[in-house]
Amino acid sequence: MRFTDAHAPGPLCHLSRYGLMTGTYPFRTDISVWPTKPVIQEKEDTIAKLLSRQGYQTAMVGKWHLGFRETGYDNPLPGGPVDQGFQSYFGIRASTDIPPYFYIRGDKAVMPPTDEIGDNATDGWSPIQGEFWRAGGISPDLKLDRVLPRLTAEAIEVIKNRDEEKPLML
């Protein structure tokens, strides 16, 4: 797939992600606020479902931020990427400023957020100052300043371990 002229369907990350995943303008739905529950309906088609039906291997690595049905950290987290056509997923439920912070593999928490992290914001904080996060639960295996390198390593593993007989959508 080659994108030569792309436009964001919404002004926020989850709105653009919803538009990319479903092909639907986000203003045609009720997802204008930060999602906590799944915003893609179970029967709604997604780019991952479409490509899977065409024989693609589909994997997602990164921030989902389209909601999960959170049922506890020891249970599956339905409504995420593996329920929307991705054959594998590794990532985080929202951005690194929205606790609780924990990695998800497939539809399960890798490690529950049993620790706490303090807020690192200061008065007058601006993006020029660097990383920002809010206080909340965090899993012992997640370091907020190491999320991007971890996601990069996971994406590299997907590429290395792909089925070379099938096209890959990552």
Where are the model-predicted features located?
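Formylglycine-dependent sulfatase
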Residues: 1-170
